[in-house]
Amino acid sequence: MLTSRSGLGTPCVHKPFLLMSFSLLILSMVVTGLLIGSFLTVVVDRVPQGGSVNTPPSRCGSCGLRLGPLDLVPIVSWLALRGKCRRCRASIGIAPMVIEPATAALFVLMAIRFDDTRAAIPAYCILVAVLVAQTWIDLQTQRLPREITYWGIGLGAVALAVAAIVIDEPERIWMMGLGGAIALLTMWLIYTLSRGGMGDGDVRLAPLLGMYLGWLNPGIVLPGLFFGFIAGAVVGVAMMAIDRAGRRTAVPFGPFLALGTIVAIFIGQHFVDLVLAR
């Protein structure tokens, strides 16, 4: 067995899927990320309006043209059509050109981060998909749909539990639960003390973020939230400085929580070690 270089300190259990070469792994993450990103463009368009992601088939929002396979190739179709419907030439919107490559890039980063603990890659790709969708929706509508959060918690918990069993570290299951509880309690206290200064969608999102960070180490949950608050504060101050936001202007916080979580996945343990060493 190989010793993990991912920072988890766990052995990598070899299964056929886990023996894939690194270059092939990265290629598969790019392709999978683009396909999932294409699906997420449907999610961010329909879920905020209460629609189904399954039906009806994708159509042009202007002329109703049903989109065929050639209209749905990630990135390529958008570029070939120059961001317009091939029949009525109405704008398709920029979402595909942001969401699809962003999802693919983050999938690749997760593959690199968990290269020697590959059983965790599917779980953290689920997190990426949820965070990309919620970030886009929050920026557009200042809402974090509970359906996406709950699906993320359910699927993520199962995927993380499976990963813990595959790497033969079942204790990570309770670590996951502890991380979720820490994040939920922390955000609930902030929500209560701020008297509405934070949305309840942020509170619902907290256990999802906490369980993923807790699976790595419950000690990095608070740093992850801290990174998010710092990023949010910096942007909020910058917006006020350029007169784009007043003190009571609502600033979507979900994207900053997402950013803080991603940062903590990569450097959270190093941050904790640095603080404890001082």
Residue ranges and their predicted role:
Residues 26-31, 97-101, 121-125, 150-151, ...:
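Hydrophobic alpha-helical transmembrane segments
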Residues 40-95:
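Membrane-proximal soluble regions of multi-pass membrane proteins
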Residues 89-166:
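Intramembrane alpha-helical segments
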Residues 237-263:
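Interfacial loop-to-transmembrane junctions
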